[in-house]
C-alpha cells in the first residue's frame, strides 16, 4: 500500500517508529489498517586505546547510545565501570570508544558476531560475564512490586504505541524511579 511515515520521538530528537498502511486480510473481507513499528538502526562500536577492536554492528532503537555502549562494555567484562571510558564519540552510526585499558582476554573474535540483531543478546555467546551477587536485606512487598510495574508501563511510550519493545526500569529502595528506557532488542535497555 506504500504509505510510510515517521512518528514519535524516542529521545526527543529522532523518530521512534514508522506508521505503515497495511492490508488486513480476513475470512470475509479485507481492510486497510495503520500499523506502527518501532525503528531499529545499526550502531557500529569500535574500541580504541591500548588495543583497537571493532566490536561489531548492533541493531538498536536510536537514542540512549551512551547508556547502551557503557552497559554493553560492562556486561561483556570489557570494562569494570564507567570510569574506564575516557571518551565516546558518535559520528552518524559509528561510535568510537576510547578506553583506559582494554583487557585482550575480554575480546575474542570467535565468540562475537559481527552483526548483533535485536534478539535477547545472549544468543550465540560462548560464555556469560559473571556479576557480583547483590548483598542486601531489603525486601519489596507484593503491592509495591505491582506499583513498580504500573509505573514502568506508564513510561514505556514506544511499547504503548507499537507493542514491539523491551523495557527496563530501576527503582531505589524508597520507591523512587531512577531510570526507565526501552529498545527493540536490548533486554537491558538501560
Q: How would you name each of these model-derived features?
A:
Residues 187-190:
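Feature captures the catalytic cores and cofactor-binding loops of soluble hydro-lyases/lyases
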Amino acid at each position: 500500500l506504500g504509505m510510510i511515515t515517521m512518528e514519535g520521538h524516542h529521545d526527543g530528537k529522532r523518530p521512534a517508529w514508522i506508521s505503515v498502511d497495511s492490508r488486513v486480510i480476513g475470512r470475509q473481507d479485507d481492510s486497510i489498517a495503520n500499523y506502527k513499528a518501532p525503528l531499529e538502526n545499526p550502531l557500529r562500536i569500535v574500541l580504541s586505546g591500548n588495543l583497537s577492536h571493532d566490536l561489531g554492528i548492533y541493531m538498536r532503537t536510536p537514542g540512549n547510545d551512551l547508556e547502551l555502549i557503557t552497559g554493553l562494555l560492562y556486561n561483556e567484562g570489557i570494562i569494570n565501570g564507567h570510569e574506564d571510558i575516557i571518551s565516546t564519540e558518535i559520528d552518524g552510526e559509528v561510535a568510537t570508544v576510547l578506553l583506559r585499558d582494554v583487557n585482550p582476554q575480554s575480546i575474542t573474535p570467535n565468540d562475537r558476531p559481527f552483526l548483533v540483531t535485536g534478539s535477547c543478546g545472549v544468543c550465540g555467546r560462548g560464555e556469560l560475564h559473571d556479576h557480583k551477587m547483590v548483598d542486601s536485606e531489603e525486601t519489596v512487598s507484593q503491592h509495591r512490586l505491582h506499583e513498580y510495574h504500573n509505573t514502568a508501563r506508564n513510561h514505556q511510550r514506544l511499547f504503548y504505541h507499537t507493542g514491539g519493545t523491551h523495557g527496563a526500569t530501576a527503582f531505589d529502595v524508597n520507591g523512587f524511579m531512577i531510570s526507565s528506557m526501552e529498545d527493540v532488542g536490548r533486554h537491558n535497555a538501560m
